[in-house]
Amino acid sequence: MNDASIATLQAAILAAHRTRFAGQDGLPAQPTPATDDGADPIYQAALSACSQLGFIACDAHTLALAWQRQSQRLGAFDASLWPSHAADFGLSAPDPAHAFAPCPQQLGLYAVLPDADWVGRMARAGVPTVPLRFKSDDPTAIHAQVQAAVAAVQGTGARLFINDHWEAALHAGAYGIHIGQEDLDALPAGALQRIRSSGTRLGISTHGYAEMCKAHAVHPSYIALGAVFPTTLKKM
């Protein structure tokens, strides 16, 4: 397939989906990552189209691979069919032996809270899921806050997740742990197995297709997707 044919496939994807991703102002187009000359034409077309739609390089690559697999699975390229089949993203059902302890399918209101006092207030008010996001470099303060948060939810039925501080969470017996992508990359060898074998639930933050696929490979209890809307809490 020549460059003109690839450009035709790219244009077909853009025509079918540009409105879908326009939003209020639309996302700015991203540079198309370089590819090998022998790359699959559908992959090349989808990579360029997804970059034009505003997907960053890793997400455009993940989508392009999914589009290539989708076309192979269906036996034809369909520009109107946005990839959504798990197998096209290389995903499969987790092996129960490697999965983390499960959470309810519906976690309800998920209120990210700055300290143990807020955790207690929201748990007593009936908020079902209360993640503690306590930011500090002081190990003593971290352990004190985590232990206080665990005590604060006793008898309320609230599910307490500890953000980032996984060792303190294990020590205090928290319901679950939540980590971001950077924390996932920084975990020491054996940390995931320690969390898994303890029966503690694990949640992982994601912000796009590539990170969701990466998180899925860990078989966590749940995967969080955000920020859907702009946030002032951290730089995204």
Model-derived segments and spans:
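Short amphipathic alpha-helix with an adjacent loop that forms part of the alpha/beta core around
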Residues: 191-195
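Glycine/Thr-rich beta-alpha phosphate-binding loop at enzyme active sites
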Residues: 171-186, 203-236
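Conserved N-terminal beta1-alpha1 strand-loop-helix module at the mouth
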Residues: 1-175, 197-204, 215-221
